[in-house]
C-alpha cells in the first residue's frame, strides 16, 4: 500500500479492482434499464497463484445459471478493448532417476540429463509454434508460447541425481489445440525419455502433472 496525499494506492487497483468498482458503480444504471438479458457479476480470487477461485466459480455458474452468451473480462490491456485472450496451462514434470556415484554413471540413471532432454524438446515445440505464427494475428506474440520457468534437481556434484523437477507452462491461442500440444510433449517423454531411464531400473520414470 502506497499513500500519496489523501490517496491510498494498493496493489491491483487497475488489475483488477478498478474494473470491479466500475462495474458495481454501473449496477444501478443496469437495473434502471430493465434489461431483457441479465448481466451477472462473477468475482474470483487468487488468479496469480493458479486461478484458485475460478474453478468453483465456473462449476457454480454451470449448475445454477444459464450459460453466458458473452463474457467481459476487466483486464486493463493498456486501456484498449480486445476481442480475446490466451489460455493458460501450467505443469510440473518430475523425473525420477537412479542415484549413484559420478564415477560410475553406467550404474545409474541421471534425472537431470533426462530432464535436459525434455527442456530441449520444449524449446523445439516453441520453435515450431513460432514458425507457424499468423502475422495478421492481434495477439502479441502471435503464437502460443511455452515457458520453462523453474528447474530443480541434484544433491551434490559427485552424485548422479535421482530427481529433477521441471515447472513449465503454455499461453495458448484460442485457435490452437492445447491438448494436442500437451500430447506431443507427453509422447516425446514416453517414447524418447522414459525408455532410457527404465532400461536402468523399472522404478525410474517421468510423471507430468497439470497444476492448473
Question: Where are the predicted features?
Answer:
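Acidic/His- and Gly-rich active-site-bordering loop/insert found
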Residues: 1-13, 30-35
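Short, conserved micro-motifs enriched in small and acidic residues
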Residues: 6-20, 48, 109-112
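Conserved Rossmann-like nucleotide-binding pocket used by diverse enzymes
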Residues: 9, 72, 147
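Acidic/histidine-rich catalytic neighborhood of metal-dependent amide-processing enzymes
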Residues: 16-86, 90
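Metal-dependent amide/peptide-bond hydrolase catalytic core
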Residues: 92-212
Amino acid at each position: 500500500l502506497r499513500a500519496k496525499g489523501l490517496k491510498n494506492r494498493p496493489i491491483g487497483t487497475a488489475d483488477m479492482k478498478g474494473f470491479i468498482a466500475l462495474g458495481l458503480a454501473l449496477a444501478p444504471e443496469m437495473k434502471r434499464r430493465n434489461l431483457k438479458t441479465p448481466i451477472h457479476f462473477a468475482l474470483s480470487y487468487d488468479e496469480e497463484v493458479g486461478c484458485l477461485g475460478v474453478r468453483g466459480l465456473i462449476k457454480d455458474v454451470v449448475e445454477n445459471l444459464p450459460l453466458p452468451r458473452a463474457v467481459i473480462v476487466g483486464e486493463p490491456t493498456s486501456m484498449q478493448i480486445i476481442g480475446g485472450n490466451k489460455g493458460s496451462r501450467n505443469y510440473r514434470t518430475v523425473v525420477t532417476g537412479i542415484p549413484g556415484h559420478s564415477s560410475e554413471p553406467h550404474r545409474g540413471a541421471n534425472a537431470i540429463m533426462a530432464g535436459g532432454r525434455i527442456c530441449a524438446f520444449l524449446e523445439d515445440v516453441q520453435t515450431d509454434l513460432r514458425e507457424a505464427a499468423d502475422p495478421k494475428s492481434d495477439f502479441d506474440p502471435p503464437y502460443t508460447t511455452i515457458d520453462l520457468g523453474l528447474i530443480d534437481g541434484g544433491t551434490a556434484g559427485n552424485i548422479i541425481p535421482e530427481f529433477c523437477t521441471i515447472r513449465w507452462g503454455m499461453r495458448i491461442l484460442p485457435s490452437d489445440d492445447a491438448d494436442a500440444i500437451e500430447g506431443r510433449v507427453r509422447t516425446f517423454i514416453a517414447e524418447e525419455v522414459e525408455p532410457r531411464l527404465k532400461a536402468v531400473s523399472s522404478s525410474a520414470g517421468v510423471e507430468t502433472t497439470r497444476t492448473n
